[in-house]
Swiss-Prot record:
Note: Genes for both Vlp and Vsp families are on (usually) unnamed linear plasmids in B.hermsii HS1.
Family the entry assigns: Belongs to the variable large protein (Vlp) family. Beta subfamily.
Function: The Vlp and Vsp proteins are antigenically distinct proteins, only one vlp or vsp gene is transcriptionally active at any one time. Switching between these genes is a mechanism of host immune response evasion.
Bilayer topology annotation: Lipid-anchor
Species of provenance: Borrelia hermsii
GO CC annotation terms, alphabetical: cell outer membrane
Domain of life the protein comes from: Bacteria
Pfam entry (one): Lipoprotein_2
SUPFAM superfamilies cross-referenced by the UniProt entry: Variable surface antigen VlsE
Record's keyword terms, sorted: Cell outer membrane, Lipoprotein, Membrane, Palmitate, Plasmid, Signal
Protein name per Swiss-Prot or TrEMBL: Variable large protein 14
Subcellular location: Cell outer membrane
Lipid moiety-binding residues (S-diacylglycerol cysteine): 19
Gene that encodes the chain: vlp14
Length: 360
């Protein structure tokens, strides 16, 4: 009888112990999941903050109205710097988030690595954009206190070749990074050629070897107004600066040649397309040195054309940069969505791997 009672008591003890262990295990599992969810909330909040950081950092720096008539070329540099600073802040915050993700509790290791990989990839893209923007800002800063659309009632002067080449290279770099990030870079509508038949035609204000004729500046402004910004960017992306080129009247010149070639015709020189002419105006307005030409009392129209051309280029560049940033942040967001719960922590896995096998 005593043996029977002892057996019953032992059984009850084992059942109670088992229940207690099960409850403790369930409690630990619940705590682990709560810790995991808390980590997810923290990561999600940090990521949402980053989405707003870039927009807040650059504020109202929208390229289509970045500069106005009367502004100095240094203003263009300030615009590039502001966007570059915003990207730097975003990149730094991403790196902070990467550290927080590494500390996430009870998260599946492979899903965490996927997020960190996406962050590293985005940081690399942002660094390339920052480098390009820093160089562009430097070119504009070097141009200094000269008016955007600097002009004279005399022969036009070619722009600094090195400065124009640096602008072309910076824009190329941004487009290349964006293209590799899956951003659609449109070709736009380049329009037809712009002839230089008289000194009253639009090309005279850009590249005449004497004072441009009456109303040439108004015609130049009209050409810039109708130019497709995407086509202008495309022409800059494929532009080549002229090396010792004396511009003639009949060759179909591209944007880089029109901006840096030596004016050699009273009527200016023919532009291959409307977009080439407008892009050349932008390049000439952004780089150091050189002048546009105008008839008496028409300098205001030249400056308006230059400002419009610059704003079109900056506007499309800003759009491309924003799309590139958004594309890379979206990739991180998708990776964050894929973070999975794991009952095995990194410490557990390490301890398990370090355990020595028993021998008999």
């Amino acid at each position: 009888m005593r043996k029977r009672i002892s057996a019953i008591i032992m059984t009850l003890f084992m059942v109670l112990a088992s229940c207690s262990n099960q409850l403790e295990a369930e409690k630990l599992a619940a705590e682990s999941k709560n810790t995991f969810f808390d980590s997810l909330v923290k990561i999600g909040q940090g990521f949402q903050d980053i989405f707003g950081i870039f927009g807040n950092a650059i504020g109202d720096a929208l390229g289509f109205n970045a500069v106005k008539s009367g502004d100095k070329k240094s203003k263009i540099g300030e615009h590039f710097k502001k966007i570059g600073d915003g990207l730097t802040t975003t990149k730094d915050k991403l790196n902070e988030l990467s550290g927080e993700i590494s500390e996430a509790k009870n998260a599946n290791g492979s899903s965490i690595e996927a997020v960190k990989s996406a962050i590293n990839s985005a940081s690399d893209v942002f660094e390339q954009l920052i480098t390009a923007l820093t160089k562009l800002a430097g070119v504009a800063k070097e141009a200094g206190s000269t008016d955007i659309g600097d002009t004279a009632s005399a022969a036009a002067l070619a722009r600094d070749k090195d400065g124009v080449e640096a602008i072309i290279a910076g824009i190329k770099a941004i487009i290349d990074v964006a293209d590799k990030s899956g951003v659609n870079i449109e070709k736009g509508n380049a329009g037809g050629p712009v002839n230089a038949a008289a000194n009253t035609d639009a090309p005279a204000a850009l590249a005449a070897n004497a004072a441009a004729g009456a109303n040439s500046t108004a015609k130049l402004a009209a050409e810039v107004t109708k130019a497709d910004p995407w086509a202008m960017i495309d022409k800059i992306n494929s532009a080549k600066a002229a090396v010792g080129v004396q511009l003639d009247a009949n060759t179909n010149y591209g944007a880089g040649e029109l901006a840096t070639g030596t004016p050699n015709q009273a009527n200016g020189s023919k532009a291959a397309t409307n977009a080439d002419l407008a892009a050349a105006v932008a390049l000439k307005a952004m780089a150091k040195g050189g002048k546009f030409s105008h008839a008496a009392n028409e300098d205001g129209a030249v400056k308006a054309a230059a400002v419009s051309a610059v704003n079109k280029v900056l506007g499309v560049l800003d759009f491309i940069i924003r799309k590139t940033v958004s594309s890379n942040l979206d990739k991180i967001r998708e990776a964050v969505k894929g973070i999975k719960y794991s009952e095995i922590t990194e410490t557990d896995a390490t301890e398990s791997g370090d355990a020595q096998p028993t021998t008999k």
